[in-house]
Structures are given as structure tokens and as C-alpha cells.
Amino acid sequence: MAQRVFVAGVGLGLLGLSALGLGACKGKPKPDPVTVGSVSLPAPIASSLPIDPKIVSAAVNAKGEAPYTGATGTISGLITVTGDPAPDMPEAIASIPADCESAKDTYGKLFREGPGRGLADVVVGVTGYAGYVPEEIPAQLADASGCAWNARTYVLTFGQSLDVRSRDSRPYVPDLMGAKLKAQLVAVPRGDAIHLYPEQPGRYQLTDSMRLFMLADVLVVKFPTHAVTGLDGRYVIPRVPVGKVKVSALLPATMVQEEKEVEVHAGELVDVPLSLAFDRKAWDARRGGSPASATSK
């Protein structure tokens, strides 16, 4: 059974990101204000939330800085998993009906691996740079097909909505657990997106009210320099200001994280591979219950 999840501020040392990015930027002179709708803000934001833009601006640009206009680079890399393979999740498997058989590939194990032990669904964030980097797009997409979301982790910059679409012949009723939704709407087959609104930074869960095994972590942070790995374990984060920065990776399914400090130079592509370890015995001990069923490679 899905449980409603919201962790205010996404504490837990998440990504080592200093309270979701409040420490990501260093002070700059106060900028000239800009107008967003009818509201005057110190700098642009990208927001589709039905809330006062000043709330978003205060969170993502706490120091009221002008947008960063200096040189940038790109950080990319491969995230792999070491240690034990992912255990099966028998409760999830048992809840998947016969007409959703392919969903077992998404939810049948604790985490998803690709070729070469590439690790999917890892949140990667870059912090520690100087300057305010505005988000460029007001929404992130979450597509449903075959009774599964297209990822088990989504990361949003605060201000973005999560836009859910049905990409097959099924309707879906998305629910962002932890958000104060007024009503649940149906994403009709191959129709328009349903907009979900996280009202503050934090950790949420996306599910489908008709298929509660469809679960994905949704992390809402205060900076735009982030990505989520696909099944190949790879990520790309552009628009990173030059200088020393911290690259942090977190797998929400296990809460294992790793970080590394690197230096970004103008126009350069910085390769930052990271490995996240999984210890089956330690995981079983933290769960405080019986070990999950054995997993075959």
C-alpha cells in the first residue's frame, strides 16, 4: 500500500546540498527588478505553480541576485552500482495484475540496473557555485505507459509543475502524495497532460490512484543544475558556472549517496563518474524485517 510521503526541506543530508541549495550561490550586488506577470522580482524565475511568484523567487533566489551571465561548463558522467544485486520486491510483484506484466521490469526489484551495472533513477545535483542560475522551463514531464512511469525518480526545480501524460491506451489518475491537491484528474489515453503542483521544496511520491504499485520519488529542490540517470546510468548537467563545485548523487530507493568536488572551466565537459554501493545485509537490517527474496542475476 502506498503511503503519503513528504519530508519538508528534504533533510536527511539529501545530496549534501546544504538545505536544498540555499548554500549553492554566493552573494552578488542587488539587481534591477524584473516583472513576472504583475509581480516585481529581483530576477526571472520559471514557474507554473498557482502561487505567488514571490514565494518561488524567495526560495530559489534567496539573496535576490541577478542571473549569472559568466562562463559555464557541463558536467556529465556514469553512475554505477557496486556490491550486491538488487533484491526482488515480492509485495510489489504480487500487486501487479496480469494485464500490467511489463511493469514488473520497473517495480519488481529494489532498484534498476542497466548494462555494465549502470544505475538508473539516481538524482545528481551540482552545488557550491557562485551566482544565481535561473530555471529555464516551467515543467517536467512524467509519462505513463504499460502501467509504469517512465522513471522511478523525478527531480524538479521549485516552481516547476510535474506534468503527467498517458502514452498508451490506458487512463491514469496521478496523485502527488504530499502535495495539497484539490482534486484528482484523469490523464486520458494519449491526451493532454495533468499538472501536479508541489507547493514547496521537499520529497514527494508520485502514484496512480488505480495502480498503487506505480510509485516514483519526486524531489523538489531550489536549484536547476540537476539530472536523473536513465537505465544506462548516465547523466548530463549543462549551464554550470565555472569554479569549484560539488557533484552529489543519491539513489532514493536505498538513500545511498556519494559526492565529489570538481573544478569547472569555461566551455569544458567535465566527466564525473560515481559509484553507489549496495550492501544487502545492511539494507535488510535497516528494514527491521525478514530479508527479501533471493535475486538471480
Predicted stretch roles:
Residues C25-K297:
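Extracytoplasmic copper-binding redox domains, predominantly the cupredoxin/blue-copper superfamily
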